[in-house]
Amino acid sequence: MLHVLSVGPSHAAFTVEAAMATMKKFHSIVGEKPAQDAEAPSVDDPNVGQIRADDKEAAHAPANAETNNEEANPSDGAQAGVKKIEAVTLSWTRGTAIWFLTLVNDFRLSMYTSLNAYATSSFLGHSLLTVINIVSYVMGGSVYIPMAKALDLWGRAEGFLLMTFFCILGLILLASSQNLPTYCAGQVFYKVGFGGLSYTWNVLAADVTNLRNRGLAFAFTSSPALISAFAGSKAASDLLAHSTWRWGFGMWAIILPVVALPIYGLLAYHLRQAEKKGVLVKETRDWSITPKTVWWAIMEFDLPGVLLFAGGFVIFLLPFTLAATAPHGYQTDYIIAMITLGLALIIAFGFYEMLVAPVPFLNYKFLIDRTVLGACLLDMTYQVSYYCYASYLPSFLQVVYELDVATAGYVTNTFSVVSFVFLFFAGWLIRWTGRFKWILWVCVPLYIFGLGLMIHFRQPGGYIGYIVMCEIFFSVAGSVFILCVQLAVLASVDHQHVAAVLALLFVMGSIGGSIGSAICGAIWTSTFLSRLERNLPASAMPDLSLIYSSLPTQLSYPVGSATRTAIVEAYGYAQARMLIAGTAFMVLGFIWVGMMRNLNVKNMTQTKGNVV
């Protein structure tokens, strides 16, 4: 175990050094935009969105002005969190900007992907993977809008620290859980925390980069995945062999504060520097806990809307996964009650937001912009499609293709490795052309093509190389989706609304992930179990429930035995139907891309200070 734990820091150090060196080269090529040389937007561009044109018109100044007092100070009228990050970027140096943009950690995600199936199996909950995903994704999605308001009102540093706390709490619960409900609760805090960190990181990336360079910035923040995708899978394998899956979560409760607190310190330090330089005037606000401030917080963060949103989607989606194992299927009384109540809560959420909420959960100004709406729907559709088949992929590779944990992790993490290369390539194309919509027209059919091939190849007896080939197709298209939908929503708003519009995008993605997990769970429970019942030999029937609920039990049967062959056949039958569902949903992507305007981000600017 000591050997395994020593893997992380060495790889992390190498990753940071390599990423910093790469970013230095990036700066030497791209250059750093001085505070006084902000790029001017193209006022003649007919594709400029209505939201952006209305909000940014007064903020734009000529690029060739010798002095620009507006660029020297944060935006007037901006919220406190926006003013703080603009002040930070106006005061920090090139070295800290490089350091900040390269400090990323993907190691824990690689380990989590490999360990999750074993953790749930220890509670006989392997078949409930999608149930846990539904709850955690919906709860994670419900915090993005309040998180956006917190980032704008309080600051990026404070939001980052809060999400770090949730991460650590979730990791502790996961590592110490003794039953499935505790593990599920840990998953909720884990997804809320790391989802919030990811969201905060994306907001910070938007804060310190211009739109034309944002693709390159995202590519460089993905560079550590070249190391963590392999090292994380290997570390997870060694933990399972020599220790326990619990250390795969527990170690991060120790490591994460060491990695995260310097980022908070960096932001807080430069905020103080900005205050000393007079770039930011410190604002005072009474945060004492009184009935008035509590009521203000409830309304400002729309907690009733959050509860209706989270409760409605969780209660509505769970029955589709649970129905197959209910006594009377969809005719079971509690299944009917959950679907009815969940749908009622979702409808109530819509009416509450339109008619009652003083500060709505969703900003309807964004939803009437066709580019923002198209990008959000494309992201949601992509997440639905992906999670239709992804939840049981690591288990499938180990049971059907007889891969060990590390090798299965390498295949599963193909996305992380390939995305860096193609994000960099797509980033350069966007920087050169200023356009991104045409790239989406290429990637949507590529993703569907990969899914179609996977329906054929992801079957028992196939060649693993074809699986990897299809994963590469997914990775190329999927990574570009993530980049382009972010560019689309960011290009449609000004800096004041960056956090809010990214929150909307993340919410739609979380809804898509939860819907995809519900579809995956419904297919799994209605096909995998029935095929086991049909094909298992009589000698294995007493262990049907254990086989269905535990990955180690499935792997315990020798390859070629009648029981293992029945399990393999059931996996292939279920996976094909999951992929068919994912392919069918992704066809909607053509409609959503068609909705988006062909924006040119080459001459747009949103940010101030030492940005790239």
From Swiss-Prot:
Major facilitator transporter involved in triacetylfusarinine C (TAFC) uptake. Can also transport ferricrocin and coprogen, but not ferrichrysin. MirB plays a crucial role for virulence in a murine model of pulmonary aspergillosis, indicating that TAFC-mediated iron uptake plays a dominant role during infection. Disruption phenotype: Impairs TAFC-mediated iron uptake. Induction: Expression is repressed by iron. The keyword Metal-binding does not apply. It is a multi-pass membrane protein. This is MFS siderochrome iron transporter B. Residues 105-127, 178-187, 237-246, 324-334, 394-409, 457-463, 520-575 are extracellular. The chain crosses the membrane at residues 87-104, 128-148, 157-177, 188-208, 216-236, 247-267, 303-323, 335-355, 371-393, 410-430, 436-456, 464-484, 499-519, 576-596. One of its GO terms (molecular function) is transmembrane transporter activity. The gene is mirB. Residues 55-78 are annotated as: Disordered. Residues 60-72 have a biased composition (Low complexity). Residues 1-86, 149-156, 209-215, 268-302, 356-370, 431-435, 485-498, 597-612 are cytoplasmic. Belongs to the major facilitator superfamily. It comes from the Eukaryota. Pfam families: MFS_1. It is found in: Cell tip; Cytoplasmic vesicle membrane; Cell membrane. InterPro entries: MFS, MFS_trans_sf.
